[in-house]
UniProtKB/Swiss-Prot annotation:
Taxonomic path: Bacteria, Pseudomonadati, Pseudomonadota, Gammaproteobacteria, Lysobacterales
First-tier enzyme category under EC: hydrolase
InterPro entries per the UniProt record, alphabetical: Restrct_endonuc_II_XamI
Keyword Hydrolase among record annotations: yes
Highest taxon, organism lineage: Bacteria
Protein name: Type II restriction enzyme XamI
Assigned keywords, A-Z: Endonuclease, Hydrolase, Nuclease, Restriction system
EC assignment: 3.1.21.4
Recorded name of the encoding gene: xamIR
GO biological process: DNA restriction-modification system
Molecular function terms from GO: DNA binding; type II site-specific deoxyribonuclease activity
Catalytic activity: Endonucleolytic cleavage of DNA to give specific double-stranded fragments with terminal 5'-phosphates
Length: 274
């Protein structure tokens, strides 16, 4: 006889949320060298970029040293010269080039100039005031620009790292729990019909379920598929947004695509704060 799934009371959810919040505070306040590592890596990138582009002296920036900078993997640092920084996708669309891959830009001077032309138009005047007037920066301007740019890139890097770590940790906890129930992991595969994907007592991670990706897909004992979303947020407002705008939207799509009797959308609250 199948038992009914548990239904948590508001008080129980509030207690779990408080426990998770306490764990979150402990993790964030723990001593770590992550920030220093990201800052030093970013600083190294910008110092090398300044060296290759003659301290961003507009008159000294040539196709050759731009190509060399991209070849050295400094494309990200170049994007962060913009105020605000510009994404890979946006830069490619605005520059109207087929690719901004370093290997491509190194061999295509026209595309390279179009890409840097976009960056020049949106260069941050607060960090790089000398680029508007031409010439070299003062030592104070140079140091301020290096510091601000390194902090900007490092902050983005560590924010991305924290999001990925939280999601990965949550997925790991879900998969470990499934293993304790006797499930085994199967290779990820595109699931376009209800019979595809993991089979009896199996699950897969990062599977394409229809046209939407699911974090974990489980083949239940009754042959239905359970799609589990593992999303991490550290504020109640963002958690509600993620539930409504991400997990709920996917759930609606999967039910419409596969039917209410065939798929069980769910949301993991294992390690999120709320």
């Amino acid at each position: 006889m199948t038992s009914a799934p548990p239904r948590w009371t508001t008080a129980e959810l509030a207690e779990d949320a408080a426990t998770s919040a306490a764990q979150f505070r402990t993790e964030r306040l723990a001593v770590t060298d992550s920030w220093g590592t990201h800052y030093n890596q970013a600083r190294g990138k910008f110092e090398l970029l300044f060296k290759k582009l003659s301290d961003l002296n507009p008159e000294a920036i040539t196709d050759d040293n731009l190509a060399e900078a991209y070849g050295l993997g400094l494309g990200e640092a170049l994007r962060y010269l913009a105020g605000p920084p510009i994404s890979d996708d946006d830069l490619q669309v605005i520059a109207d080039v087929e690719s901004i891959a370093p290997g491509v830009l190194k061999k295509n001077a026209e595309a390279l100039r179009k890409v840097f032309g976009v960056i020049e138009r949106v260069i941050d005047p607060h960090r790089f005031p000398w680029m508007e007037t031409g010439g070299m920066p003062t030592e104070q301007q140079r140091e301020a620009a290096l510091l601000a740019s390194s902090v900007l890139l490092a902050a983005q890097r560590i924010a991305t790292e924290r999001r990925n770590e939280g999601k990965d940790n949550q997925e790991t906890m879900v998969k470990d729990y499934l293993r304790t129930l006797g499930f085994t992991e199967a290779p990820a595969a595109a699931i376009n019909t209800i019979v595809k994907g993991p089979q009896a007592m199996q699950f897969c991670a990062e599977c394409q379920l229809g046209e939407r990706k699911a974090d974990v897909v489980v083949r239940l004992h009754d042959t239905r598929l359970m799609a589990i979303e593992c999303k991490v947020s550290n504020s109640s407002t963002n958690s509600v947004k993620r539930l409504n705008n991400d997990a709920a939207v996917k759930a609606e799509y999967w039910i419409k695509q596969f039917g209410t009797a065939q798929v069980v959308p769910s949301r993991s609250l294992v390690s999120s704060r709320y």
